[in-house]
Amino acid sequence: MAKRTVATKKRVVKVDVKGQLHIHSSFNNIIVTITNDEGQVISWSSSGKMGFRSSKKNTPYAAQMAAQDCAKVAYDLGMRKVKAYVKGPGNGRESAIRMVHNVGIEVTEIIDVTPLPHNGCRPPKGRRV
């Protein structure tokens, strides 16, 4: 006898005109997420999702492509203004914000939320090249 499958109801996310843009830029990858004011994810993208591999993932061009992909989906759903929260030391932070603006979403604020240690964990040792 076959098991009965229960159809799960897809969660509906409310899209407002205003929202939040989160850019997480590490040394290896760039992740761009657009949420509504409650923090529910509307669209997301990363440079790895766009097809970039290895060291090409942390380039300003990869950040532009990821931000453009993420912003187009949010723009089509009706988002027009965002606050940008930028986290991390990587490349492509400014170019991602510029690309979101070029898609047609107005960036009202840019806030740097990079965590700074108060002498916490020991950092990785420097490379000898």
Curated annotation (Swiss-Prot):
SUPFAM superfamilies: Translational machinery components. One of its GO terms (molecular function) is rRNA binding. It holds the Pfam family Ribosomal_S11. Keywords: Ribonucleoprotein, Ribosomal protein, RNA-binding, rRNA-binding. It comes from the Bacteria. GO terms for biological process: translation. One of its GO terms (cellular component) is ribosome. Belongs to the universal ribosomal protein uS11 family. Part of the 30S ribosomal subunit. Interacts with proteins S7 and S18. Binds to IF-3. HAMAP family: Ribosomal_uS11 (MF_01310). This is Small ribosomal subunit protein uS11. The lineage of its organism: Bacteria, Pseudomonadati, Bacteroidota, Bacteroidia, Bacteroidales. The gene is rpsK.
